[in-house]
Amino acid sequence: TIGIFDYLLNEDIKNIERKKNDPIVIAGNLSSVKAKYLKKLLPEKNIKINLYGKGLDFDLPKNITYKGTFLPDNIAGKIDGGYGLVWDGNDIDKCSGVYGKYLKYNNPHKASLYIVSQLPLIVPSTSAISKFVLKNKIGLTINSIKDIDNKLKQIKEEDYKEMQKNLRILSKKLLSGTYLKNVVNEIIKDWS
């Protein structure tokens, strides 16, 4: 199983109070080449989305708000939302295309961003990061973006608070370089 990347910052992130009904966050490269699925998000859904990143090259439906571009060192404490979506590719039904299929093998940087931002993750069930998310109880998995509305309705307030608690713990680990230290210690142990 895949682990997670640390997310080192010069400043500490305070505990952030999130609400489960706040908009879903999508951060990263927003161009239609990498995130073609964004063009297929339906405006009539009850889901509100906040976009962060560069490359936005199409008009947005009313339920999607573009929040701008931030440097990786500055965005973590500024993200406004209730969940962070990890999804790439051409389609909303599955992670397709080169970028979508890559999520089966990749640990996306945005997952670490969402964790240090204390945002519960929504990830594809086929992604390499899905087992990490479920094991650490920091989010949920979906087969299709169309599943999000129903999945979120099933999340109880106490479930969301547990995810928040787990994210605060994990956030501190990522911010302090715990996962890199673990890898280095494993390498040293193997060479001893």
Give the positions of each predicted feature.
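Anion (oxyanion) recognition and catalysis
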Residues: P43, I115, L134
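Short alpha-helical
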Residues: S32-V33, A128, D147
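A short acidic/histidine/glycine-rich donor-binding loop in glycosyltransferase catalytic cores
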Residues: N136-I142
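A charged, aromatic-enriched C-terminal amphipathic alpha-helix characteristic of glycosyltransferases
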Residues: N15-I16, N143-K146, N150, E157-S192
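Active-site-proximal region of nucleotide-activated glycan assembly enzymes
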Residues: T1
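Nucleotide-sugar-dependent
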Residues: I79-S117, V123-K131
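Conserved catalytic-core segment of nucleotide-activated headgroup transferases in glycan assembly
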Residues: F5-D80
